[in-house]
From Swiss-Prot:
Binding partners and assembly: Homodimer.
The name this protein goes by in its record: UPF0210 protein NGO_1297
Family named by the database record: Belongs to the UPF0210 family.
HAMAP family in the cross-refs: UPF0210
Annotated InterPro entries: UPF0210
Record-linked PANTHER family: UPF0210 PROTEIN MJ1665 (PTHR37560:SF1), UPF0210 PROTEIN SPR0218 (PTHR37560)
Organism: Neisseria gonorrhoeae (strain ATCC 700825 / FA 1090)
Top-level taxon of the source organism: Bacteria
Length: 451
């Protein structure tokens, strides 16, 4: 890869003035060779493999950050879904495995570890059910472990038994962790991807290599600055500006990923070029949409503006790297985006509008706080709605929702750090309890028959 001096100067400006960073270098680690019928042996094997494969990740990231002057905010680990790896133990709880993941991740200094996960889009094995029922206690007793559940896909339909259990799991987690914080580490997916470097939904897919490096970049501030400084008038010209900016962002991520791959002697997997916001002013996806001409994010036209942004980011990234993967689009996590927080507090950005936006953007309903008395079946209904959008449109959708115990609409909750803070948003008054309790499976749509 040849880098021109002009690109270097542009990158310096992006970092210094526009909050550009490499959000994460994530090592995916396969744990199939750790399997044992003895859960204590399994835990020791898992600890040994993670601390061996990941031991140099943090030092490598610091070296590359200093060498290129680009902040690398997080170093993370993702592992094979634990429901698969722990099945042979026949244990009635996998909390000890979550605690092992936590211990191993802390030992090597990473910020998060993902993969306390179950893939149940078509049905739940006994091990899947044990894992999901272990999630609340696992989130309570660990600090940096993330959990995900894939409850649907375009090929399989939606597993409504798993949707019901996921809603109950989130509700229980909210009840036993301070201000529901444990729920910030749980994602429920439809069409989950196997190479996602972002938390909380990262896991290492079964079709992946023994270890692989996946990189996530982030540059909402860069895109907004590019639009502010351009003379684009029509939306066609706006799309072109975004596309060219995404190209530049992706080039930096590609460079960091391939350098990390060489230093760690681990294959480079994918570059996820999602625009991931932070609560910092100047690092907001919502403000990009407003720069296009919306008075406030969430008003009419927001979904169209987001569709333009998401598509232009993908097109620019594809030209800059042959290894684009993961989720690659625009994230809309309410608590992590200063502009979305403001729009939600103003009452313009609602749960319904966010759901519409998820039909055209990178993932789904993300980091949304709801009242603590929201019933489990309502959470399951929200998950089912979001999964339906993903299933029908053959895209990844997800829900990361936090019922905040003791809080109601109009209150706010502080999560801190990259997770920011969120106003508590209302859920619908009507009940979907009978619908959710029917269980079974929503059949795969006609779009699933592609062969």
């Amino acid at each position: 890869m040849s880098i021109q001096s002009g690109e270097i100067l542009e990158t310096v400006k992006m970092v210094a003035d526009q909050n550009f960073d490499v959000r994460t270098i994530t090592i995916g680690i396969d744990l199939h060779d750790c399997i044992s019928t003895d859960i204590d042996v399994l835990n020791q094997n898992i600890y040994n493999k993670i601390t061996t494969v990941g031991k140099d990740l943090v030092a490598t990231a610091k070296h590359l950050s200093a060498k290129y002057g680009v902040p690398i905010v997080n170093q993370r680990i993702s592992v094979t879904p634990i429901a698969q790896i722990a099945a042979a133990t026949k244990a009635d709880s996998y909390v000890s495995v979550a605690q092992t993941l936590d211990k191993a991740a802390k030992a090597i200094g990473v910020s998060f570890i993902g993969g306390f996960s179950a893939l149940v889009q078509k049905g739940m094995s006994p091990s899947d059910e044990v894992l999901i029922r272990s999630v609340p206690e696992a989130m309570k007793t660990t600090d940096i472990v993330c959990s995900s559940i894939n409850i649907g896909s375009t090929r399989a339909g939606i597993n409504m038994d798993a949707v019901k259990l996921a809603g109950e799991t989130i509700k229980r987690t909210a009840e036993i962790t301070p201000e529901g914080f444990g729920c910030a580490k749980i994602v429920v997916f439809c069409n989950a991807v196997e190479d996602n470097p972002f938390m909380a939904g990262a896991f290492h897919g079964s079709g992946e290599a023994d270890a692989v490096i996946n990189v996530g970049v982030s540059g909402p501030g860069v895109v907004k600055a590019a639009l502010e400084n351009s003379d684009a008038v029509s939306l066609t010209e706006v799309a072109e500006v975004v596309k060219k900016t995404a190209f530049k962002i992706t080039r930096v991520g590609e460079l960091i990923g391939r350098e990390a791959s060489k230093m760690l002697n681990i294959p480079f997997g994918i570059l996820d070029l999602s625009l991931a916001p932070t609560p910092a002013v100047g690092d907001s996806v919502a403000r990009i949409l407003e720069e296009m001409g919306l008075s406030v994010c969430g008003t009419h036209g927001t979904t169209a503006a987001l569709a333009l942004l998401n598509d232009a980011v993908k097109k620019g990234g594809m030209m800059a790297s042959s290894a684009v993967g993961g989720l690659s689009g625009a994230f809309i996590p309410v608590s992590e985006d200063e502009g979305m927080i403001a729009a939600a507090e103003a009452g313009v950005l609602t749960l319904d509008k966010l759901e519409a936006m998820t039909a055209v953007c990178s993932v789904g309903l993300d980091m949304i706080a709801v009242p603590g008395d929201t019933p489990a079946h309502t959470i399951s209904g929200i998950i089912a709605d979001e999964a339906a959008i993903g299933m029908i449109n053959s895209k990844t959708t997800a829900v990361r929702i936090i019922p905040v115990t003791g809080k109601t609409v109009g209150d706010s909750v502080e999560f801190g750090g990259l997770l920011g803070y969120a106003p508590v948003m209302p859920a619908k008054e009507g009940s979907c309890e009978v619908f959710v309790n029917r269980g079974g499976r929503i059949p795969a749509p006609v779009q699933s028959m592609k062969n």
